[in-house]
UniProtKB/Swiss-Prot annotation:
Organism in which the protein naturally occurs: Clostridium botulinum (strain Langeland / NCTC 10281 / Type F)
Source domain of life: Bacteria
Keywords for this protein: ATP synthesis, Cell membrane, CF(1), Hydrogen ion transport, Ion transport, Membrane, Transport
Localization in the cell: Cell membrane
UniProt cross-references to InterPro entries, sorted A to Z: ATP_synth_OSCP/delta_N_sf, ATPase_OSCP/d_CS, ATPase_OSCP/dsu
Protein name: ATP synthase subunit delta
Gene Ontology cellular component list: plasma membrane; proton-transporting ATP synthase complex
Lineage: Bacteria, Bacillati, Bacillota, Clostridia, Eubacteriales
Membrane topology summary: Peripheral membrane protein
Length: 179
């Protein structure tokens, strides 16, 4: 249920951003606000504190962000405080990023390897994924020593798992079944 709400909030803000030709600015500002909330224990305590009323929380946010973000973003943040959804701002940001990718015929691909991909490997992977999904690929690379070797790719709900750790687990399962 909340994913649906996150999507609705994100879509509403995206439409406002699009009308004002400020999609990139809004995404950047929201990322900054999310980072500030995540990295500030004081702000988290204020937002979670049951004895600090909604009006005071809104005043604090207005003081913090009035000259740092667009007025429409500030209004959005205040609505989230009013609806007690501000602690879920990151989910709304992620939904807004998804909407941005969808509207621009792009898709995000998360790639895990033990060592960084070479330039040629990265380009080939982007090309193959682009052909498969018929979209521009935004590659997010991650180094993960636990996969031992190979490559793990997640695009949306699709997973391509060519990791050594998964192969070893599969072999172990096969051997245990035989016993």
């Amino acid at each position: 249920m909340y994913e649906y709400l996150d999507r609705r909030y994100a879509l509403a803000l995206y439409e406002v951003a699009e009308e004002n030709n400020k999609v990139d600015e809004y995404l950047r500002d929201l990322k900054e606000v999310v980072n500030i909330i995540k990295n500030s224990e004081d702000i988290c305590k204020i937002l979670k504190h049951p004895e600090i009323n909604t009006s005071r929380k809104k005043e604090i946010f207005t003081e913090l962000f009035k000259d740092k973000v667009d007025d429409k973003i500030l209004s959005f943040l205040l609505v989230l405080i009013e609806k007690d959804r501000i602690l879920y701002l990151e989910e709304k940001l992620k939904e807004m990023e998804k909407i941005y990718l969808e509207k621009n015929n792009m898709i995000s691909a998360n790639v895990k390897t033990v060592i960084p991909l070479l330039k040629e490997e990265r380009e080939e992977l982007i090309e193959k994924l682009g052909n498969k999904y018929n979209k521009k690929i935004i590659l997010e690379e991650e180094i993960d020593k636990s996969i031992i070797g190979g490559v793990y790719v997640r695009v949306g709900d699709d997973v391509l798992d060519g990791t050594l750790s998964t192969r070893l687990k599969d072999i172990k399962k096969m051997m245990l079944k035989r016993e």
